[in-house]
Every structure is written in structure tokens, then in C-alpha cells.
């Protein structure tokens, strides 16, 4: 006879793969009611809380706003942006990167035409972006960021909005790699008990993650969130004290102290580079992607840094330091 406090747990978990991005996950048996309890929780996490990558900003040569059209390109800018939102990406080494797309027509432009390095993978390279009908060269700069769930462009307002150049188009970001998820609860039976549940989760992803792994991550998130209820009297663990950081004082000085030309200084501030420590972590390639910053300005920056024993491409641990508060950055921006 089963004790009152003994709950059945699933004896089998079956993953029925329909294809690489679509699968049905079956859990049984569950106590009556637990099918809907777990199904609802997992479905909400899969839809709203899964991390992933998305294109969040687009800059097209010759285009100032999304209501434009491009001569020699079949699609208007709005349709191009919608197609770019459908590009499925994986990014391993960083939280943010910038990619470029350069294509000369006539011909079809696909996700495979996006130039990328080893840290970025496009899992749907045949995805259509646009069609060039004339002898036009399309040049596009794409910002890719990691995030979670769905984030509207308006909610990503930041301090650099006032300095953002015309033509940098913001996209609503759907970071979640889960495209569709649904569940049903069916009847299950164990020996003489016929009042049990069987949970069937129907899951489809964009290809950047396998359905089985998506379920596993969602279950891990759920487990971490409810673990605190196991022992409500448990004291919160004190946060470890951070050791005092040893940082060269010159890195904490604003870039204005480098006495660069007005053009170079403004270009750096437009990219949220307010301190010398921010600057030395950038590479030459990254700086050359900065609007209005050319090779002459880059040479000037390198020479000034070299005179102080610094260089571009340096790696700084624990930057920015705790002592560099947000209000300090705001003050630097207002200088």
C-alpha cells in the first residue's frame, strides 16, 4: 500500500524526435494534476526565459529610417528588417558582436552572405534576407547581442541614444530559441491506478538548441527558482567580499585627458568609451567600425596610448572596477 506522502515520479522520459528542431517529450506517470502543474510551468519558462542571440541593431548604407526603399533591391527596408529578425545565430565567446553583410547584385541575399568569425554560427544559412535586382551593392552592419526571452526595442533605451547616429535602426529582439511549445495531458495507468497523468510536450526550436536540451535547461531554471522553498528558514548566504582591485590609476582617467582631437574624442564617446580603461580593451578592427573614425584618427589614438605605455587590445580583469560607479560614467559623459 502506498503511503500518503509518497508521490509517484516519472518512471520514463521519452524523447520522440520528429526532426532536428522538432520533438515530443513524454513524461509518465505523474500524480493527478501534476501534468498541468509541470506543463504550465515548463511552457512559460520555455517561451519567456530561455537565453539566446538576436540581431538588435541594423545599419544600412544610404538608409536613414525603416520606411525607406533601396534602389535596385526588391524588398523595402521594413521587409529586410523582418527577414533579418529570422536569422538564427549562436554566439560562444562574447555577449555582443558586430557583423557585416556586403553583397553586389543582381542576386539573392541570404544569411550565408553575412561575414562572421569562428565565434558566430548561423544555423539557417539559406534564410532569405532580400533580392537585389539591379547592379547595386548592399552594405549592412548588424549588431548581435545575447539576451533572454523577448525584448522590445523601446525597452532597450540606453545612455547612448542621444549620440546614436541617424540610420542605426533598432529591432525588437526575440532571443528565445524556442519557436513553438504546447503540451497536452493524457491519462496514464500504473497497475490498478487509472487516475494518473501523462505529460506530452510538443516543442520546436530555431535550430540553435536541440529540443531535448531546451527542456533540460527549462527544468534547471524551474528547479533553481523553487529550491529556496525547500528550507524557508535557511539564512541567505552572505555575498563574498570582493577583494580590493589593483588597477593602474591611468586607466581610471577619462579619455579627455589624452588630449585627442575633437573628432576622435567625439567618436569614442559615441561608442560609450569614456575612460582610458574602456579604450585600451578595444581592438583596431573594432575602432575602425566606429562611424566617422578613420585610419588617421586610429593612428592618433595608438600614438597617444603608446606615449603612456599603453596599447589597444589589452585585456583587463574585473573591468570596470566596483569603484567606478554608474554616476561616475554619467559625469564622464557630461564632461
Curated annotation (Swiss-Prot):
Molecular function GO labels: DNA binding; DNA-directed RNA polymerase activity; protein dimerization activity
EC number: 2.7.7.6
Superkingdom classification of source: Bacteria
Classification via InterPro entries: DNA-dir_RNA_pol_insert, DNA-dir_RNA_pol_RpoA/D/Rpb3, DNA-dir_RpoA, RBP11-like, RNAP_asu_C, RNApol_insert_sf
GO process annotations (BP): DNA-templated transcription
Alphabetic keyword roster: DNA-directed RNA polymerase, Nucleotidyltransferase, Transcription, Transferase
Disulfide pattern: none
Catalyzed reactions: RNA(n) + a ribonucleoside 5'-triphosphate = RNA(n+1) + diphosphate
Region (Alpha N-terminal domain (alpha-NTD)): 1-233
Stretches for region Alpha C-terminal domain (alpha-CTD): 247-335
Enzyme class at the top of the EC tree: transferase
GO cellular component, one term: cytoplasm
Pfam families tied to this protein: RNA_pol_A_bac, RNA_pol_A_CTD, RNA_pol_L
Family statement drawn from the similarity comment of this UniProt entry: Belongs to the RNA polymerase alpha chain family.
Notes on the domains: The N-terminal domain is essential for RNAP assembly and basal transcription, whereas the C-terminal domain is involved in interaction with transcriptional regulators and with upstream promoter elements.
Function: DNA-dependent RNA polymerase catalyzes the transcription of DNA into RNA using the four ribonucleoside triphosphates as substrates.
NCBIfam families listed in its UniProt record: PRK05182.1-2 (NF003513), PRK05182.2-5 (NF003519), rpoA (TIGR02027)
Subunit structure: Homodimer. The RNAP catalytic core consists of 2 alpha, 1 beta, 1 beta' and 1 omega subunit. When a sigma factor is associated with the core the holoenzyme is formed, which can initiate transcription.
Name of the molecule in the record: DNA-directed RNA polymerase subunit alpha
Organism encoding this protein: Alcanivorax borkumensis (strain ATCC 700651 / DSM 11573 / NCIMB 13689 / SK2)
Lineage of the species this protein comes from: Bacteria, Pseudomonadati, Pseudomonadota, Gammaproteobacteria, Oceanospirillales
Gene (UniProt): rpoA
Amino acid at each position: 500500500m502506498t503511503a500518503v506522502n509518497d508521490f509517484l515520479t516519472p518512471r520514463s522520459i521519452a524523447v520522440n524526435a520528429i526532426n532536428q528542431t522538432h520533438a515530443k517529450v513524454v513524461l509518465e506517470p505523474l500524480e493527478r494534476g501534476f501534468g498541468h502543474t509541470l506543463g504550465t510551468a515548463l511552457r512559460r519558462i520555455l517561451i519567456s526565459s530561455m537565453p539566446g542571440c538576436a540581431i538588435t541593431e541594423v545599419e544600412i548604407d544610404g538608409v536613414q529610417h525603416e520606411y525607406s526603399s533601396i534602389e535596385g533591391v526588391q524588398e523595402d527596408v521594413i521587409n529586410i528588417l523582418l527577414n533579418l529578425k529570422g536569422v538564427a545565430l549562436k554566439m560562444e565567446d562574447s555577449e555582443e558582436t558586430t557583423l557585416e553583410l556586403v553583397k553586389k547584385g543582381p542576386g539573392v541575399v541570404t544569411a550565408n552572405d553575412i561575414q562572421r568569425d569562428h565565434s558566430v554560427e548561423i544555423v539557417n544559412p539559406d534564410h532569405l534576407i532580400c533580392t537585389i535586382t539591379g547592379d547595386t551593392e548592399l552594405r549592412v552592419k548588424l549588431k548581435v547581442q545575447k539576451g533572454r526571452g523577448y525584448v522590445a526595442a523601446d525597452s532597450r533605451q540606453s545612455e547612448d541614444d542621444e549620440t546614436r547616429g541617424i540610420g542605426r535602426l533598432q529591432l525588437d529582439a526575440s532571443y528565445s530559441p524556442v519557436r513553438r511549445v504546447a503540451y497536452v495531458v493524457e491519462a496514464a495507468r500504473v497497475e490498478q491506478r487509472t487516475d494518473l497523468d501523462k505529460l506530452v510536450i510538443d516543442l520546436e526550436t530555431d535550430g540553435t538548441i536541440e529540443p531535448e536540451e531546451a527542456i533540460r535547461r527549462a527544468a534547471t531554471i524551474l528547479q533553481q527558482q523553487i529550491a529556496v522553498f525547500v528550507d524557508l528558514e535557511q539564512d541567505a548566504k552572505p555575498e563574498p567580499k570582493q577583494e580590493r582591485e589593483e588597477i593602474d590609476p591611468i586607466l581610471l582617467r577619462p579619455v579627455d585627458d589624452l588630449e585627442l582631437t575633437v573628432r576622435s574624442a567625439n567618436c569614442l564617446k559615441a561608442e560609450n568609451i569614456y575612460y582610458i580603461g574602456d579604450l585600451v580593451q578595444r581592438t583596431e578592427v573594432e575602432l575602425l567600425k566606429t562611424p566617422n573614425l578613420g585610419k588617421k584618427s586610429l593612428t592618433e589614438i595608438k600614438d597617444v596610448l603608446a606615449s603612456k605605455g599603453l596599447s589597444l587590445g589589452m585585456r583587463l580583469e574585473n573591468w570596470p572596477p566596483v569603484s567606478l560607479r554608474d554616476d561616475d560614467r554619467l559625469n564622464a559623459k557630461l564632461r
